[in-house]
């Protein structure tokens, strides 16, 4: 027997028993962004490696350790996209979507990072994100947060997530803070772990994001970025908080919150949860006003967020919020005898035409009544339609209830669509 080929570690199949939950989640996402007037953009999975080096930052973990990068047959360095924002900016610049325009965009698709697989975090993962271009005011920062909050409401998990906010200031403010933070960290250089020592000069704000409790203890008296912010940045952040208060969205200001990507400025945020064990991030984003210009476009304000769908699916399963996911089949059509089978196929096709939203599965492969009913029950259908010799002769269909304790009913063939429409 030939050796079975397995899926690559950290890259998972979504099986038929799992896909209804994914479809429900994706429907909620699409309906919500549509309600806010956002348009979908789809970009290639493979991009030039330089795109991510220039956007994410060459000294970030993603670029240094996690990207799937390879040379193609022409010797060009290509990378499987590790996140969606850079590709969206590249597409916007390339197709003239951004300069002197306002764009509200959303995307959804697979991303790739070579990191250690763990529950809810994989090497291929599905990401959903929104990006807004051309608006620099705090009201649009509030809008993307309101949109994310609406997602939690529709998914039923509002009480299980907390919004954390911070502001990183503009580049000049951050540079002044960077110098102060380096000066503070240098006092403890020998006590820092190897990763923090490396980050201290290349990306010192990321030291604030350390998971090492010993390093966290050293940061207790570290200077805070808020102390280095100018009046304009403070006003922007204050107005954002005012807007969130006005619509009743609760938040926590976390002065240690930084983002793992270099392009963020001013507003940054994360929605976090403790429902998956240790506190984890389920959605993150912020403002990145310099990225469009950094990637060859004109100076364009921008803000957005991204979320990994695997973590949301895991959260819905953990909180047992998957019980109302409907089966993939509404009606299962069976037949007893060759002549009846032809009629059953015609009935199934007719129902699909008359009731386009009805999910109809026809029994294929023959078998006795017991076998067909077993398949019908396994399909998850609400009812089975039985067409035997008697039903065929009388131009009727037997409707057998699979989920309710009700007597089987005989329905005239020409009244079947109306009967099923009222039933399901």
Swiss-Prot record:
Keywords: Aminoacyl-tRNA synthetase, ATP-binding, Cytoplasm, Ligase, Nucleotide-binding, Protein biosynthesis. GO terms for cellular component: cytoplasm. Homodimer. Belongs to the class-II aminoacyl-tRNA synthetase family. Its main location: cytoplasm. It comes from Shewanella sediminis (strain HAW-EB3). This is Histidine--tRNA ligase. It is an enzyme of class 6 (ligase). Its EC number is 6.1.1.21. InterPro entries: aa-tRNA-synth_II, aa-tRNA-synth_II/BPL/LPL, Anticodon-bd, Anticodon-bd_dom_sf, His-tRNA-ligase, HisRS-like_core, HisRS/HisZ, HisRS_anticodon. One of its GO terms (molecular function) is ATP binding. HAMAP family: His_tRNA_synth. GO terms for biological process: histidyl-tRNA aminoacylation. It holds the Pfam family HGTP_anticodon. It is found in: Cytoplasm. It catalyses: tRNA(His) + L-histidine + ATP = L-histidyl-tRNA(His) + AMP + diphosphate + H(+).
């Amino acid at each position: 027997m030939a050796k079975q080929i397995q899926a690559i570690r950290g890259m998972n199949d979504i099986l038929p028993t799992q896909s209804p939950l994914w479809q429900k989640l994706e429907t909620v996402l699409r309906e919500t962004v549509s309600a806010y007037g956002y348009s979908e953009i789809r970009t290639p999975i493979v991009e030039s490696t330089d795109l991510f080096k220039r956007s994410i930052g060459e000294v970030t973990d993603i670029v240094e350790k996690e990207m799937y990068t390879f040379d193609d047959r022409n010797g060009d360095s290509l990378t499987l996209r590790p996140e969606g924002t850079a590709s969206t900016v590249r597409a916007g610049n390339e197709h003239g979507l951004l300069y002197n325009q306002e764009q509200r965009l959303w995307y959804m698709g697979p991303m790739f990072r070579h990191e250690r697989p763990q529950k809810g975090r994989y090497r291929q993962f599905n990401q959903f994100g929104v990006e807004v271009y051309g608006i620099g005011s705090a009201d649009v920062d509030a809008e993307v947060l309101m949109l994310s909050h609406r997602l939690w409401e529709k998914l039923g998990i509002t009480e299980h997530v907390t919004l954390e906010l911070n502001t990183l200031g503009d580049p000049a403010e951050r540079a002044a803070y960077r110098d102060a933070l380096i000066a503070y960290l240098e006092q403890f250089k020998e006590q820092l772990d190897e990763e923090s020592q490396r980050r201290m000069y290349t990306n010192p704000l990321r030291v604030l994001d350390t998971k090492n409790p010993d390093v966290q203890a050293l940061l207790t008296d570290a200077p805070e970025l808020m102390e280095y912010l100018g009046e304009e940045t403070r006003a922007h952040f204050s107005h954002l908080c005012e807007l969130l208060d006005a619509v009743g969205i609760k938040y926590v200001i976390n002065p240690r919150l930084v983002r793992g990507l270099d392009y963020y400025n001013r507003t940054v945020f994360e929605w976090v949860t403790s429902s998956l064990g240790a506190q984890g991030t389920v959605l993150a984003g912020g403002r990145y006003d310099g990225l469009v210009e950094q990637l060859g476009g004109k100076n364009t304000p921008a803000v957005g967020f991204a979320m990994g769908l695997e973590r949301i699916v895991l959260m819905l399963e953990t909180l047992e919020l998957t019980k109302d996911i409907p089966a993939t089949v509404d009606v299962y059509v069976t037949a007893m005898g060759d002549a009846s089978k032809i009629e059953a196929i015609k009935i199934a096709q007719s129902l699909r035409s008359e009731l386009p939203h009805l999910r109809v599965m026809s029994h294929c492969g023959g078998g006795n009544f017991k076998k067909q009913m077993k398949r019908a029950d396994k399909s998850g259908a609400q009812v089975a339609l039985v067409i035997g010799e008697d039903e065929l002769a009388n131009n009727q269909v037997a409707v057998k209830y699979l989920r309710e304790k009700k007597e089987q009913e005989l329905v005239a063939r020409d009244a079947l669509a109306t009967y099923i429409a009222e039933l399901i």
